[in-house]
Amino acid sequence: MLSADLTAFVLTLKLALLSTFILLIIGTPIAWWLARTNWRLRFLVEAMVALPLVLPPTVLGFYLLILLGANGPLALLGGGTLAFSFTGLVFGSVIYSMPFVIQPLQDAFQAAGKRPLEVAATLRASPWDRFFTVAIPLARPGFITAAVLGFAHTIGEFGVVLMIGGNIPGQTQVLSIAIYDHVESLDYTSAHLLSGGLLVLSFILLAAVYASNKRFRVLKL
């Protein structure tokens, strides 16, 4: 593996870990609200969350580039320029992977039901206690699935990160873009090495999710 590829690998892991952490922090309250609310316009929020699933990555990346660019709304408000930077990659990755984190969490909170929370309320548990000691433990499979899917999806990003970050070695060049560069230069050996590594890693992560969820169902029974 070339030093540039190793740098891209480290950058990709850093991006995936940070994006997944941020997604879990902001996605948990959103998923909890979506699972509990009776607001009749909830479907609009759910549609916004799911939008990255159907939008072409280049479309999402284009509008994020405008938002984060030198003449974008963020810069005009004094937020600076985040395009073609690692911070911009994190911002774009969080938006692009949001449905892969929020939807499993929402499903897990809904599957837990209201009954355990009502029982905890009769024992005088505060809303915070009910959330952290009842809802979150019951939704553990959803958290595992959300974390793994968010992480794996971020690792495999191409269109969005290319649009927002370009292809700057050591700064915004992630593994998927490095693979593309190797294919363009007909360096199939390096492309095989990186692609195979991502393939194996993705399979291991998904297998771990299914194994963990199966174990949780067995323990629940």
Where do the PLM segments sit?
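Cytoplasmic-entry segments and transmembrane alpha-helices of multi-pass inner-membrane transporters
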Residues: W33-L64, L117, P141
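Membrane-interfacial helix termini and adjacent extracytoplasmic/periplasmic loops
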Residues: G61-V94, I164-I168
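Membrane-helix interface segments
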Residues: T37-V45, P73, S85, R115, ...
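C-terminal transmembrane helix and the adjacent membrane-cytosol boundary/short C-terminal tail
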Residues: L41, Q106-A125, T133, H192-L221
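Transmembrane alpha-helices
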Residues: F21, I102-L105, F109, G113, ...
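Transmembrane alpha-helix signature in integral membrane proteins
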Residues: D5-L34, V94
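Interhelical loop and adjacent transmembrane-helix boundary motif
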Residues: M1-T7, I164-F203, A207-A208
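Membrane-cytosol interface at the C-terminal ends of specific transmembrane alpha-helices
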Residues: L82-A121, V134, A146-A147, A207
